[in-house]
Regions:
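Alpha-helical segment proximal to the catalytic Tyr-Lys
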Residues: 120, 163-164, 238
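Residue(s) in the substrate-gating loop at a strand-loop-helix junction
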Residues: 134
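Substrate-binding pocket helix/loop in short-chain dehydrogenase/reductase
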Residues: 91-92, 96-104, 210
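Conserved glycine-rich cofactor-binding loop
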Residues: 13-15
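C-terminal helical subdomain
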Residues: 174, 197-236, 240, 249, ...
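Active-site helix of classical SDR
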Residues: 115, 150, 158
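Short, small/polar-rich loop/turn modules that mediate ligand/substrate recognition or access, typified
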Residues: 166, 171, 240-242
Length: 273
């Protein structure tokens, strides 16, 4: 973004949301950061000049208040980063209904509520929306039904905005990160390491195993996803609408059917051997 805009970033207390808020702040944009935890948001406020508005993404009154806070502070609203999210596991046959409800409330209903409150202002500003989904929206893992379903639905929610509001100047796109070093991912890796008895390597060993088939051979960093989000919000992406951008080190380019044959899984040297 090379002109100064007003952007709401949800789930900004850590990880991709925090990195995005910092990136936009460095560019001189006016950022309103939201999340459930107050202290990380207040720290961002002190360090970047963002406006902190702690709130529950699934509470309609809180979401309306978030949009009003942005308008009261800056008089306009140009962009949304729909990043707030939680993860819960389970299969369709054994998941806890409470987990399903929690995930859908935060990962899907929350973005819908924010879009509903913000769209009249985004239309006036000819603004942009970026949804932070996941590669789980494109391809699934074992025991991941609530999270994957919510992220696939978020993807289509954003595409609906692209279709329904494109003629009014609003763009909506989606990024789909793979494993990224965030607090949520760190917790999951620590749990994986414990369940797999990985020993002293702990979460780092789990990251290595989880990204073994990623062509770039590593997890992503929050800033790398933030850079993609910043571009999609910017005038440089003015004709990009309804797009789904994997930010995944190439993992969605792999054909799982060849993995068992190890055609290209072992890293090669610089000669291509």
């Amino acid at each position: 973004m090379n002109d100064k805009r007003v952007v709401i970033v949800t789930g900004a207390g850590s990880g991709i949301g925090e990195a995005t808020a910092r990136l936009l702040g460095e560019g001189g944009h006016h950022v309103v950061v939201s999340g459930r935890r107050s202290e990380p948001l207040r720290r961002l406020e002190r360090e970047t000049g963002a406006l902190a508005y702690p709130s529950d993404a699934g509470d309609p009154a809180a979401v309306d208040g978030l949009v009003r806070a942005a308008l009261d502070a800056h008089g306009r609203l140009d962009g949304l980063v729909l990043n707030a999210g939680i993860g819960r596991g389970g299969t369709a046959g054994d998941l806890a209904l409470g987990d399903w409800d929690d995930v859908m409330r935060t990962n899907l209903t929350g973005p819908m509520l924010l879009l509903r409150a913000a769209l009249p202002h985004l239309v006036r500003a000819r603004g942009a929306v970026v949804g932070v989904a996941s590669v789980s929206a494109l391809r699934n893992g074992v025991g991941n039904a609530p999270y994957a379903t919510s992220k696939a639905a978020l993807l289509q929610l954003c595409r609906s905005v692209a279709v329904d509001y494109g003629r009014q100047g609003v763009r909506a796109n989606v990024v789909c990160p793979s494993w990224v070093r965030t607090e949520m991912a760190d917790r999951r890796m620590a749990r994986f390491a414990q369940e797999a008895e990985l020993g002293q390597g702990g979460a780092e060993s789990a990251y290595q195993q989880a990204t073994a088939l990623v062509p770039m051979g590593r997890p992503g960093e929050p800033r790398e996803v933030a850079e993609a989000i910043g571009w999609l919000l910017s005038p440089a992406a003015s004709f990009v609408n309804g797009a789904v951008l994997p930010v995944d080190g190439g993992v969605t380019a792999i054909d799982p059917g060849t993995v068992a044959f190890d055609f290209h899984i072992t890293p090669r040297d610089g000669t291509g051997r």
